């Protein structure tokens, strides 16, 4: 696998909690105050991402989160902000 989907999903969670507080709570009914892996676990539980009975499928939960992000189902989210590109005097 070229991309670690769970790691990428975790980074997306970290970004959303920091830059768009409340969006994960609203969309997935998860607590944003917990660590990233626990948040992904909660998404897996709430979306019934299971493997062999009751084992959580974290890969599937991460793919679901990433697909929702890519397709705009989480909302209008931008990864770049104007202040990231503001020039300082003398440049």
Model-derived regions: residue spans:
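Helix-rich effector regions associated with P-loop NTPase G domains
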Residues: 1-91
